[in-house]
Amino acid sequence: MRTQNNLTVEVDCHSLGSNECPSMTSSFSPMDSPTPTPTSIYSQGSLASPGWQDAGSYPGHAYERHTGATPMRSAFRLAGMTSNENMGMSYGAMEAQERMPMPDFLSAYDDNVEHFWLPSDGPKTYETGTHSLPYPHTLPQCPPMVRSNYRPHAAYLPEAATNPCLSRSIFHHAERVPQSMSMGNMMPWIPQATESIAPQTIAPSQVGPVTPPPSYSEFPTSIQTFKTHSPTTPLRSCSIGTASGPDTPISRLSGGAADYLEDFQQSPPFRDGLNRLQRQPSRKMIRKQSSRQNMSLENLPSIIKQVQFKCKEPGCKGRFKRQEHLKRHMKSHSKEKPHVCWVPGCERAFSRSDNLNAHYTKTHSKRGGRNRYVATLDESSPDYDPDFRGQLTPDGLPIRGSTLDDPMPNSREYSVDGLDD
């Protein structure tokens, strides 16, 4: 039968105040814990389990506030561990002679204490997940960057985001380069001669063809400008180092913009695209060239067609498109005037009937004129009758039943020698 003994742990708190270190002297029975563990001595309420909020000296000491002499006088000494020391004592892989028996510390555990062996001078390396006490997670350990002023506790950023040589474009004018991009500020980024950088290589399966930008139709016009422009800025003239591989972006910066453009010109996609542009002009250029050819005098269509009918009368320059027009025009040159005005006393003759009708309308259908008024030719008169042919009164009214052969009434002569308008 196992004898139950009480273990008394005394903690010297002379260096701490009464509020900070309450009485830690109490009786503890190891058999009260169902599963004896090394940390079970903190679960009875007599010895407060140390938390990270109580560790005032973190990261210096992980378990207690070390302000004076060592507070714990017992052999179970846990103070003096740093923040990166291990709390899970890895005793399983140690030799049996290097282990320190647990009954030396806790006399109540007489048997079956194989899993309570603690190393006397075991390595104190921190291993995540080997202890039950909470521990703040730190940032993941990243490979150190090759820099002369590398800070191990700084947050890791990609090289392209922190290196000014890679975060800005190389195609900048000299006046646009800020003062922070001077050669003196870039010296910390340049690796020293003693440091070596592993060549950055890319597998052949990952290397894709170099394709020009979408607007490469405008790119050839500016190639000569880049070639003739001498590098004056540190970004174009400085060499970032020879340890980098031949295909890295850093090697592109060592030669400046001209080398990169020469390599870009030699790429097959660029040559094919340039040749295609030279062989196949755009539709806009084709339309422009065709419009210029059409505007030439030789290709202009004849706006006025060549007339086929000309007046043969000497001195007449009449030109007509139709035969009937020429025939009507030739009557004006002849002496024949078959169309005569029927109004008594007028007797005007015209070579064309349309001219006679115009004479009736303009000369004899108006009152107050020099010519004789005829009521039968006036559309506004109640006696309007364009087919009437006979004698008229002195006022121009028609004499119904008379003919042109009848004598004029009252033997009165009317001057009807009107002039055409």
Swiss-Prot record:
Pfam families: zf-C2H2. The keyword DNA-binding applies. Residues 379-421 are annotated as: Disordered. One of its GO terms (biological process) is sporulation resulting in formation of a cellular spore. The keyword Manganese does not apply. A zinc finger (C2H2-type) spans 309-333, 339-364. Keywords: Activator, Conidiation, DNA-binding, Metal-binding, Nucleus, Repeat, Sporulation, Transcription, Transcription regulation, Zinc, Zinc-finger. The lineage of its organism: Eukaryota, Fungi, Dikarya, Ascomycota, Pezizomycotina. SMART domains: ZnF_C2H2. Induction: Expression is controlled by flbA, flbS and fluG. This is C2H2 type master regulator of conidiophore development brlA. It comes from Aspergillus oryzae (strain ATCC 42149 / RIB 40) (Yellow koji mold).
